[in-house]
């Protein structure tokens, strides 16, 4: 078995994931809400367990003199250092909440990241030839389960009406992904401080040294070249977030040298790219309400409703000011 773009095994795993999602949908679509919630939560918990158990399979561990030893990569990757890994940790807790904003985030980011991996399974492909992939077959299984789970659970949650999406809450997708990146940064800083990863190399302020799969530290590869996917985000990044604001004498870098501001450089691209994708997903499930709201809004404008709205807003502002400073208003 060797997984390559568009070969038999590429489509095999894709069809298997789609089939599993469709199968679960029909198997439990008429079940009681308690059963549906139990199935979905069990899948999430199983994913969290697998995340830590992966330290006991190659390449995260190896046999040394008859004993299983966790490798340095195993210790590094047991943390939550990319978007999918962080969601594996957070989704079980989000699912238990009744917060509609968090569950909208769970749906949008889960489905979007799951679809990306469904069509571009980068990690298995990067393992190399058939021998290398077979040596790490259990990790390939883990990879596909985790990324299928991240997509399937939120999708089934909405299809089974365990949660109702709203197009008015699409803003939680870009905001949520940016907050998630702060969580990842915190993980990586702790890892670096505790010695699990050398977060920076000798050119510390130029390119990241390890674990930048979520592009938090910039779109550049370790050799300084532009990553193909990161380059898409780079198009929408303001120039101010691509340069050093001051000189850094310790590294011989002058003010204005190329340096992507960690996290900040992703703010504008996240809103420009993620928001329309999340809105598109919302239209699948909330398109009718959007249509009705649009018709109402157009009629409201034609009837002169906006003018009345601004008048009411003005009265509310004056009332609020009056209640806050009654003495000043009386003096006037």
Language-model segments: residues:
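Membrane-interface capping segments at transmembrane-helix boundaries
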Residues: 28-34, 279-296
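Membrane-proximal helix-loop-helix units in multi-pass membrane proteins
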Residues: 88, 94-153
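Membrane-interfacial loop-to-transmembrane alpha-helix junctions, especially the N-terminal start
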Residues: 33-46, 101-107, 173
